[in-house]
């Protein structure tokens, strides 16, 4: 639960600072689905660590999530599925389950935010207090703010930089990390 809370906190900071940059969520529906995904995306680790994102998708898709419609549950499952490794493909059942273009857009945008938040939170203990995000021209710059000024953030920076190709492909932005 603590890791999920850390990831959700950073995910919401990214969400709030990147409206119309990484997402176009007008009615904050994506934000509430992102919140659920932050708490469920790791659930597949109980089955298999290597492909846990796929198992998380299966578990979320097939469980009863009170308060969420079938469409919303499919989006939450897709956010968890695509927060790591490959991007959606037409042949993926997890992508085919998303009916509308809006659902696909929400799932893709929120999974990118979860991917970034998860990358920043690799350690068991919290080390990042917040992120500051700036957009200039075609560059998105992340400044990681540590809980401890003496803490080396090389793991977090390296992990976040691993998202470079995905951000470039999806949003045509150059990722920079300070």
Regions found by a protein language model. Name each.
Residues 3, 9-133:
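Divalent metal-dependent catalytic cores for phosphoryl transfer on phosphate-bearing substrates
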Residues 1, 22-23, 168, 172:
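Glycine-centered secondary-structure boundary/capping sites
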Residues 123-175:
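Low-complexity, glycine/alanine/valine/leucine- and proline-rich hydrophobic stretches
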């Amino acid at each position: 639960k603590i890791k999920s809370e850390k990831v959700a906190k950073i995910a919401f900071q990214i969400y709030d600072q990147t409206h119309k940059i990484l997402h176009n969520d007008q009615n904050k529906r994506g934000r509430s689905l992102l919140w659920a995904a932050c708490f469920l995306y790791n659930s597949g680790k109980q089955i298999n660590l290597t492909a846990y994102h796929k198992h998380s998708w299966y578990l979320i898709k097939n469980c009863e999530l009170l308060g969420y419609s079938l469409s919303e549950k499919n989006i939450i499952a897709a956010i968890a599925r695509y927060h790591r490794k490959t991007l959606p493909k037409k042949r993926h059942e997890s992508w085919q389950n998303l009916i509308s273009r809006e659902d696909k857009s929400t799932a893709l945008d929120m999974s990118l935010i979860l991917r970034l938040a998860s990358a920043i939170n690799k350690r068991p203990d919290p080390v990042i207090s917040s992120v500051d995000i700036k957009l200039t021209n075609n560059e998105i710059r992340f400044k990681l703010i540590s809980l401890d000024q003496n803490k080396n953030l090389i793991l977090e920076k390296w992990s976040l930089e691993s998202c470079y190709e995905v951000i470039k492909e999806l949003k045509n932005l150059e990722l920079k990390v300070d």
